[in-house]
């Protein structure tokens, strides 16, 4: 009999939820992570008494009551509501696109006026079958909003002009004809008081954890420790990039402590012009309504990904989709290994969905 029932590769949200459920079911688990900390990309660290989101803003939101109840076992959530603003050459616009945005953009006051303005711009453009993101955006919100709030920002995010991006990406941007700045249309929303790391620590309570362990560098020896493996690393790396590397976008952060108590008045400010090199600035204290004398900001830069960089967003185009489908066949044929999470499934996952999937996989595994 092997020393552990499960070797869980990755101490992020998927790995932590699975480990928690497995331990609860009486299984012997070892969690390893190649980083020097748990919690994966939702890791928060205290700086000047402020919980800093090291890998970018993470705002928990869900419509799934069971998932909400699940996370509330491990943390108390505050009432933070995501209401980012856009800065376009010093003009400030509310996001998501709503009546506040339209009022600032055109001076319109009623939903009927805003709708008329957008319809007029859509008609002028005359796009019936959008072939790329630029056409899709203009066909949804007209030219003004596209030019000021989408074009530069999205181009920076993806490192290519909107004319070269697939139309479907823009579906992630909601449009509303109400004066409502709440970005997520979710029943439940907030940030765990004390940060995400403390929440994941609670999930992993009583589970053996080894950090700074590179699974793929010592795979055979680590595999020998456990009956089954739950792998949440990159699926292509697992197979030695045999079919080629899946593409990602990466993100780089410049974080600094400032000797002021309030730098920008909002947790998230998107810079939507093409000239500003960063995509947004995060002021971390506002996630937890902080009143500390100093503040910590992170400038976020979107970057091309190459092997060795931190993979953030899968590039969900046809080419990468087809390549992942081939890797998935290999993954499905791999005995005693469960592939899961953002990297293991090459998928953009919101946090609540990661938990949902991890719980459902754990239920099947542990039956």
What are these regions (language model features)?
Residues 4-31, 362, 366:
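N-terminal Rossmann-like FAD-binding beta1-loop-alpha1 element of flavoenzymes
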Residues 310-367:
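C-terminal catalytic lobe of FAD-dependent flavoproteins
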Residues 48-123:
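Dinucleotide-binding Rossmann-like beta1-alpha1 core, especially the glycine-rich loop
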Residues 20-48:
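Glycine-rich FAD pyrophosphate-binding loop
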Residues 215-330:
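Mid-domain catalytic core of redox enzymes
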Residues 13-14, 36-37, 100, 155, ...:
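Short, solvent-exposed loop/turn segments at secondary-structure junctions
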